[in-house]
């Protein structure tokens, strides 16, 4: 192996490690906001609302929402790119499982009995974890959550790279 190949392989492994770390941070952050029920990322809040409407688990609801967005993404780009679809699903599956697991774990701590001020701080910490994790995994640039891919598609295919407008459209 040449030095260049070794560097590329090392970089690839490091990027996957950062993706794994970001999945853990992201899942804990989302689980904190779900348990606190004081505010969350908009897509997670929507999934939690659906979870309360039907008999599916939170994990199944999050995964189902991810699959729906994967289909929407394929429609928006007018083609099926299997690498992109598989990447979105590879992100969504552990993401859904981990949020369900961490939510159950956090609920058992009795954290919801804390005073409101402390719960607000915990909820804000959860939102900050989500922001940090999203930044990490997007920099790893391996696979995306379907909702983040959706925003990127809107931004670059339809809004000439304007991130601000893409974020607003993404939430509609």
Predicted regions and their residues:
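Core subunits and conserved enzymes of cellular information-processing
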Residues: 2-172
